Amino acid sequence: FARKSGCYNLTLNVWSCNPSAIKFYESCGLRPQKVHLEALLSADGPGAGSAEAAPMIRLARPDDLPALGPVYGVARRFMAEHGNPTQWSDRYPLPEDLEADLQRGELYVFDQDGVIHGAFVLRLGEEPSYRSIEGAWRSGAPYGTIHRVAGDGTVHGLFAACMDFCKRRMSHLRIDTHENNAVMRHLIARHGFL
């Protein structure tokens, strides 16, 4: 957001997609400026020099695995509190699941100043569980599959960042969720999945 007043140009960096926050800043005379994710994540982008950098998406490393247990714990509790207590079991994903994702180079994390705030899996190529489905896929083109999206609840916009990241790597994406996961179903639909 930026507001020009006399000789001064005030710039306030706000990393929010919250409509209420945006309306508040607009009511103060500030105007929104759309910034692409690449610019936010680059070293010299709009957030450079700010006190808090935007979360960076990167491949997970072995030393990230201990931080993922609590992240997935928050996600399991969130799902249970929002009408979906059965999609992920008490300990899902298991540490060995995450280790296998890491070894295949499919596990990504949201890293903000060395703190892991979320994770997801992007699997490029055929997904065995999609070989037999009810209905039909709209395209038989090569695709990537998104699995195990989770955040710790402290950073907003992780799902949108995940989608942008995945779309830059594969033009055809597939994702699924449990029928009781209303929050994820809403997010998936909002990002153009049918």
What residue ranges belong to the model's regions?
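Conserved active-site alpha-helix within GNAT-family acetyltransferase domains
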Residues: 16-34, 160, 179-194
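Conserved GNAT-fold acetyl-CoA-binding loop/helix
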Residues: 76-96
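Conserved GNAT acetyl-CoA-binding A-motif
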Residues: 5-13, 168-179
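C-terminal "cap" of GNAT-fold acetyltransferases
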Residues: 5-56, 143
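Conserved acetyl-CoA pyrophosphate-binding loop and the N-cap/start of the following alpha-helix
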Residues: 153-165
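Conserved acyl-donor/pantetheine-binding loop and adjacent beta-alpha core of acyl/acetyltransferases
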Residues: 121-154
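Conserved beta-strand in the GNAT
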Residues: 109, 115-125
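A short beta-loop-alpha structural element at the N-terminal edge
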Residues: 56-70
